[in-house]
């Protein structure tokens, strides 16, 4: 993987020891991995809240109230996250991060993005198929329109990519910038952070949170081995779209107003439902 050039000065030593050499306490605090996580979450939250208010006003003025719109609204609020992180990257010291979001990384290309989407779809699709064949769940067809399908796919992609911009784009590369070349530290820290931001999910359990942390580390491995944040975006979106829009299964413990298939809850025992919710919360927003 090609590490983003942040024009930082090399010092003697290795790893964390090299980072601390010759730095003041404020430089250490505000250049730390913890600060990257805090700043990332603040930007993430502000962007989502502001966009939610804007979309609520627009939707109310236009009289939007359909199931498709109410489902898309939940995902489209994450477009504000895109805006906040791109504005942050316009600051001179953060401009190298634009490479992680755009085409600056070798693997940030359309083929890698499409591969990620396909892999995410197949991974979740196979698990859902096995659950159906085993009799754990039963799905029934509800409705379909090509317009809703495309609109909601774009909406889900915006949400999934927003989380990847924060975790595998901003935080991952800020940690690499802090601890020069410490890829394992970057993967572990942003993976743990990825799990912690889902701790308020409906029905979240310790096992589910640990599972999400592992998933965050897996996404970091994609960024490392394929030099592609876009592939992680695609895989995340493919999984979430398959789960919540195609199959109508809980995402973050929530079932959305619109989905192509629906879960027949009458055929699912409480034990199976809880197990399925935990298993499928790993990629939830």
Question: Which functions belong to the PLM regions below?
Answer:
Residues 1-26:
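Short, Lys/Arg-rich, polar N-terminal cytosolic tail immediately upstream
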Residues 16, 51-72, 96-162, 172-178:
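Juxtamembrane helix-loop-helix connectors linking adjacent transmembrane helices
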Residues 158, 267-285:
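Hydrophobic alpha-helical transmembrane segments
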Residues 162-189, 221-228:
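Membrane-interface helix/loop boundary segments of multi-pass membrane proteins
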């Amino acid at each position: 993987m090609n590490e983003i050039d942040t024009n930082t000065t090399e010092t003697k030593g290795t790893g964390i020891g090299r980072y601390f050499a010759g730095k003041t306490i404020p430089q250490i605090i505000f250049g730390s991995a913890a600060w990257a996580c805090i700043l990332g979450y603040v930007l993430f939250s502000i962007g989502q809240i502001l966009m939610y208010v804007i979309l609520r006003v627009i939707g109310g003025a236009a009289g939007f109230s359909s199931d498709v719109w109410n489902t898309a609204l939940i995902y489209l609020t994450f477009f504000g996250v895109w805006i906040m992180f791109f504005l942050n990257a316009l600051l001179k010291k953060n401009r190298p991060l634009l490479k992680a979001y755009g085409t600056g990384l070798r693997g940030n290309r359309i083929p890698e993005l499409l591969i990620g989407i396909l892999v995410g779809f197949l991974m979740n699709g196979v698990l859902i198929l096995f659950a159906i064949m085993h009799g754990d769940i039963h799905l029934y067809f509800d409705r379909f329109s090509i317009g809703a399908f495309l609109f909601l796919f774009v909406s889900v992609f915006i949400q999934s990519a927003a989380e990847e911009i924060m975790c595998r784009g901003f935080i991952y590369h800020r940690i690499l910038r802090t601890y020069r070349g410490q890829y394992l530290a970057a993967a572990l820290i942003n993976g743990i952070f990825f799990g912690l931001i889902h701790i308020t999910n409906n029905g979240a359990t310790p096992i589910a949170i640990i599972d999400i942390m592992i998933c965050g580390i897996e996404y970091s491995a994609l960024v490392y081995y394929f030099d592609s944040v876009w592939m992680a975006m695609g895989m995340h979106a493919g999984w979430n779209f398959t789960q919540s829009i195609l199959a109508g299964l809980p995402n973050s413990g929530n079932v959305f107003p619109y989905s192509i298939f629906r879960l027949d809850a009458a055929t699912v025992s409480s034990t199976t439902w809880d197990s399925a919710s935990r298993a499928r919360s790993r990629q939830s927003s």
